[in-house]
Amino acid sequence: MYDGYVALIDQDRIRILADGFTFTNEIRLDAKEEFLYVVETTGKRISRLRVRPDGKLTDREIFGPDNLGKGFPDGVTFDAFGNLWGTLIMSDQLFALTPEGECRILFDDGVPAATDALEKAFYARAVTPELMLAAAGKVAPWMASVTFGDPDLKTVYLGRLRGERIPYFRSPDAGLPMVHW
């Protein structure tokens, strides 16, 4: 199902800039604001579009693997070196895509048997709440977002949809400051 889109709000109207995505989720601009990265959660991939000076999006392509593997990409953020960090919810993995598009798993908190069962059900269109609930790690169950914080932007915070705390760790690399800072 391709029902996702990217829209821009201009003063009094909304314009759809790109559509045909599979469950559009989070979006991020790179440091130079040359490319917009779009998380396609149930498409299991990240798409990238060139941002033209007039705001139009062109040259759509898949960035990184065309299938990120088990789980579903959710939250993303950039580090200062141009690596796109992201989460795979339901497999509870933290990954990074290098500027060249190579995928590296940085942290794996998943439950392999539960994730395998959920993957099989996803492709059979037979996902149940019980399968989803079983696919939850211990440190960051249903890991859904990632961001860099603290003054040096070297503390990584992992957002999760289950649990009562926010896991974090120190990174040797800083995050990319947000454009609006």
Identify the residue ranges that each predicted region occupies.
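Beta-rich, blade/repeat-based domains predominating
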Residues: 1-6, 15-35, 65-86, 91, ...
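A short loop-to-beta-strand structural motif that recurs across blades of beta-propeller domains
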Residues: 4-7, 45-47, 93-95, 165-167
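Blade-level signature of beta-propeller repeat domains, shared across WD40, Kelch, NHL, RCC1
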Residues: 140-181
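Beta-propeller blade signature
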Residues: 2-11, 171-174
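Predominantly a core beta-strand signature of beta-propeller blades
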Residues: 3, 13-16, 59-62, 102-104
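Short loop/turn segments immediately following beta-strands, especially the blade-tip
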Residues: 49-56, 99-104, 109-111, 169-180
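Short loop/turn segments immediately following the C-termini of beta-strands
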Residues: 41, 51, 89, 99, ...
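A detector of repeated loop/turn-to-beta-strand junctions in beta-rich toroidal repeat architectures
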Residues: 1-3, 43, 57, 91, ...
